């Protein structure tokens, strides 16, 4: 047992003894639930922060606050609630029995205080502790003072402590909530209907990813946590709901990284009688609007960069982006789509760039990997990348002028993908062929290839109107709005390996 652990155990024992003492005299067994908190710290600061000491004395303002003790300095307590902090004061005029109980209060305890509002000599508002009640005794001490946790892993494992002591973490998750609300309000304003589709699928689909597998006991079948809601949302468009969206979780049984968590949040939407260009226009409008609403500006800092959501955003084909960011590579500069269709040419190009390739990769996969290796990290400003090959876009409509590519884009900011959208493939026969090609790819060793979904083909045979659809990664978008660089900082409880 370390010295630090011994000290912590001693503090816990002392706090338990204090709780036992409180329980002996408290009818609620030390955990009362009858305190009426009427006021929040931030509201008090906003309403009375401009008054002088003498003015407050004359006004005789009575306030009732509750929150967690974050500091104890002599007769002063710093109390934190969801809105902010305010002080409480156990001065000379506090009753003797309350004064005695005050000595038993510890940092971390949750208390309720009622009394007159005053201004200290330093200019801080405080509530005189004319009445107070211990509401919850904290048995474990908070980290030293309240400067925050220094160990990142502990912050993720004990998010509740992180939120107590780190204002930055609280602000990030408040911003996350605001971003989600702003997106929802924007979509509703554009006449989209919010829907909910299954989280468990009998056939995984809608994206190229490895699913989580579970078992349904009553039906005695394997089921899959959804990797995307796409195929169900498009079934709804077939059914006549022309504009639908869903904000919910997806699950992909893949690795962890600063950009990836196996459980993540997406906003996916579909609109009939639209194409992928309409989606790009809508995305520009949405992000510009959200930035203005939440930040008051379309520009926001991100690391060493300033991201400008004002638009218009750059639009490049994948092939042109590779050329733009490899200006000194003569082979790339002269590359045409005919060469991109040559798998041996693409393999040799990838190898010349020092890349490790898989034997089952198609021409389209090789092009995407080269893009990801040489161009994607350089896309700091909002950028739409179009011209995705059909063999890596099994659900997207083929381009009318070049059947090798599709009417698809991915949207990048800060060197990472944030959204993916395309004109939907509504040709049931073409979709049937592409599903079969995905099955062949899976048989060849690609465990991220899609399954064949016969019911979805049946839905398409009933007729899907011309439709465009898009998915936006909420977590990655929030990373931009909070200037954070790992997805774990914007997910309240990220996936972690169990301890011990």
UniProtKB/Swiss-Prot annotation:
Pfam families assigned: tRNA-synt_2, tRNA_anti-codon
Family annotation (SUPFAM superfamilies): Class II aaRS and biotin synthetases, Nucleic acid-binding proteins
Family, as annotated: Belongs to the class-II aminoacyl-tRNA synthetase family.
Alphabetical UniProt keywords: Aminoacyl-tRNA synthetase, ATP-binding, Cytoplasm, Ligase, Magnesium, Metal-binding, Nucleotide-binding, Protein biosynthesis
CC cofactor note: Binds 3 Mg(2+) ions per subunit.
Annotated Mg(2+) 2 binding sites: 417
Protein's organism: Shewanella loihica (strain ATCC BAA-1088 / PV-4)
Subunit (UniProt): Homodimer.
GO molecular function: ATP binding; lysine-tRNA ligase activity; magnesium ion binding; tRNA binding
This protein's record includes keyword Protein transport: no
PANTHER family (alphabetical): LYSINE--TRNA LIGASE, CHLOROPLASTIC_MITOCHONDRIAL, LYSYL-TRNA SYNTHETASE
Cofactor(s) recorded in Swiss-Prot or TrEMBL: Mg(2+)
Keyword Cytoplasm: yes
HAMAP family, per database record: Lys_tRNA_synth_class2
Protein location: Cytoplasm
Disulfide bonds: none
Any single GO CC term annotated in Swiss-Prot or TrEMBL for this entry: cytosol
PROSITE patterns for the chain: AA_TRNA_LIGASE_II
Binding site for Mg(2+) 1: 410, 417
InterPro entries tied to this protein: Aa-tRNA-synt_II (IPR004364), aa-tRNA-synth_II (IPR006195), aa-tRNA-synth_II/BPL/LPL (IPR045864), Lys-tRNA-ligase_II (IPR002313), Lys-tRNA-ligase_II_N (IPR044136), Lys-tRNA-synth_II_C (IPR018149), NA-bd_OB-fold (IPR012340), NA-bd_OB_tRNA (IPR004365)
Protein name, as recorded: Lysine--tRNA ligase
Reaction(s) catalysed by this chain's protein: tRNA(Lys) + L-lysine + ATP = L-lysyl-tRNA(Lys) + AMP + diphosphate
E.C. code: 6.1.1.6
Principal subcellular localization: cytoplasm
Top enzyme category: ligase
